[in-house]
């Protein structure tokens, strides 16, 4: 009986330690950084709480097959300057290059809407970014958010990277250069988020 009591005491001492270790593993990223509460947020975004809506077509940005990078970026900048709001992509296919979202700006795609990336790398502005494990000057992604607090992408629409041409060229180069990287082929990325918090996609 005494041996059984000692065994129970040993188990009682071990279990809290084991559970504490498990909880610690769950609550931290692999690099040891604590996982913040916002990272667990899984409720649908309510754009009615995000400020004014900036619908592309209200600002003469149309689904006409043309690249509208400058116009959409100007609208993002306007929304930020006016205190923030939601860039709304309505039904249709809207073409653009890289876009840099600002503090208090958000992206919403209506059902049937497509924000399609240009297949010309020159439409993605150069800037300091990270790709393939290094910080460098490289072409931006289609959607960029750096240093933001409270950025969201939501809606039932589609963000289309339009990357088939880059994909084909990359694997064509790989046939004669096995060391070819995404940077060598100058492939843009779809979404790039860094140095930000309270992000929901």
What feature does the model see in each segment?
Residues 6-8:
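Small-residue packing motifs within transmembrane alpha-helices
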């Amino acid at each position: 009986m005494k041996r059984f009591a000692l065994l129970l005491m040993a188990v009682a001492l071990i279990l809290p330690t084991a559970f504490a270790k498990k909880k610690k593993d769950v609550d931290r990223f692999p690099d040891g950084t604590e996982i913040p509460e916002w990272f667990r947020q899984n409720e649908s975004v309510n754009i009615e709480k995000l400020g004014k809506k900036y619908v592309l077509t209200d600002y003469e940005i149309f689904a006409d097959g043309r690249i509208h990078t400058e116009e959409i970026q100007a609208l993002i900048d306007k929304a930020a300057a006016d205190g923030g709001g939601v860039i709304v992509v309505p039904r249709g296919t809207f073409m653009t290059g890289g876009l840099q979202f600002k503090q208090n700006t958000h992206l919403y795609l209506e059902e049937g809407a497509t924000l399609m990336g240009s297949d010309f790398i020159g439409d993605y502005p150069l800037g300091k970014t990270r790709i393939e494990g290094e910080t460098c000057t490289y072409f931006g992604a289609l959607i960029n958010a750096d240093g933001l607090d409270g950025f969201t992408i939501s809606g039932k629409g589609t963000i289309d990277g339009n990357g088939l041409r880059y994909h084909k060229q990359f694997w064509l180069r790989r046939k004669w250069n096995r060391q070819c990287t995404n940077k060598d082929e100058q492939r843009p990325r779809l979404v790039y988020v860094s140095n930000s918090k309270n992000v929901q996609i």
